């Protein structure tokens, strides 16, 4: 089967080079060299990725992936979708967040009775 597939690919490339105009004959048409599997097995060759740091991404289901991220962290967790949780888990998470959601009491502002004229003598030149 693989010999048949490679023969068909060769015939297709030969047919494409004859049918294509002269300027398009030198285009890279083979897909077996630069597919996604090869790209994932090699290192990053570009200098534009020099400032990306390797971190561990934790998904909602608990699975982990090593990715590159612009900020230096060790672990990055994805937020949990509250709609997918059971009602008991949702209530437990809400109870945890209740302390953070409470409004802080605002302190009354102090009355400002500063008089500029009283201290003006200290910064004027004589």
From Swiss-Prot:
Endoplasmic reticulum found in the keyword field: no
Similarity field: Belongs to the mitochondrion-specific ribosomal protein mL55 family.
Subunit (UniProt): Component of the mitochondrial ribosome large subunit (39S) which comprises a 16S rRNA and about 50 distinct proteins.
GO BP: any one term: translation
Keywords: Mitochondrion, Phosphoprotein, Ribonucleoprotein, Ribosomal protein, Transit peptide
InterPro entries linked: Ribosomal_mL55, Ribosomal_mL55_sf
GO cellular component labels: mitochondrial inner membrane; mitochondrial large ribosomal subunit
Pfam families, per the entry: Mitoc_L55
Gene3D superfamilies from the UniProt entry: Mitochondrial ribosomal protein L55
Organism the protein comes from: Bos taurus (Bovine)
Protein name: Large ribosomal subunit protein mL55
Source species, domain of life: Eukaryota
